[in-house]
């Protein structure tokens, strides 16, 4: 059985991968996340997911066979990528832009072994209710939005802003479990392994 490495420091991605019963080792694979000139949001998230998987592969010292899973999520409003907020003003500005509107969340996953790399991009639409400036400031003060694309976490306190979701909840959190299980299956890594081991 191939060993799996998750090239991510995200605790949410670790939780989601654990949820589907796939044993893995998490590794940190930092790459430059600056968008390229004229790069579409879809191309951006796919490039970053592949880049993280490739960076992870360079870190791994295990003998083959193994696979590396990389992922990236972008919040997109009117074609513009909203990254992780740099400070309170940035986070509040993002939330005010998202307030009362529908936005797109793109999550890309990439799996590679020594021979090939396959990727998928999952698109979800999230609709926010109206948010007051006071709510945005209080949310920032909670600490939750600091490391989140678009300045919010759907799985935490930020859920109160979400009026609707069309797509994959787990993809908005950071790892689309259905597509991840399918893609890992193509590489001979089945889900529910930890259930069979008990």
UniProtKB/Swiss-Prot annotation:
Keywords: Cytoplasm, Hydrolase, Nucleotide metabolism. GO terms for molecular function: dTTP diphosphatase activity; UTP diphosphatase activity. GO terms for biological process: nucleotide metabolic process. The active site is at residue 72. Its cofactor is a divalent metal cation. Belongs to the Maf family. YhdE subfamily. This is dTTP/UTP pyrophosphatase. It comes from Pseudomonas fluorescens (strain Pf0-1).
């Amino acid at each position: 059985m191939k060993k799996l490495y998750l090239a991510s420091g995200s605790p949410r991605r670790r939780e989601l991968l654990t949820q589907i019963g796939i044993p893995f080792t998490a590794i940190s694979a930092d790459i430059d996340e600056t968008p390229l000139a004229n790069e579409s949001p879809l191309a951006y998230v796919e490039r970053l997911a592949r880049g993280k998987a490739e960076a992870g592969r360079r870190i791994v010292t295990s003998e083959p066979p193994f696979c590396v899973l990389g992922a990236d999520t972008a919040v997109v409003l009117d074609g513009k990528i909203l990254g992780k907020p740099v400070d309170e003003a940035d986070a509040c500005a993002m939330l005010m832009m998202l307030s009362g509107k529908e936005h797109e969340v793109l999550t890309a996953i990439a799996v590679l072994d020594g021979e090939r790399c396959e990727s998928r991009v999952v698109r979800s639409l999230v609709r926010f209710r109206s948010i007051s400036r006071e709510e945005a400031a209080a949310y920032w003060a909670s600490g939750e939005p600091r490391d989140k694309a678009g300045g919010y976490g759907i799985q935490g306190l930020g859920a109160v802003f979400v009026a609707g979701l069309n797509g994959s909840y787990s993809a908005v959190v950071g790892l689309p479990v259905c597509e991840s299980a399918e893609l890992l299956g193509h590489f001979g890594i089945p889900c529910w392994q930890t259930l069979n081991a008990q």
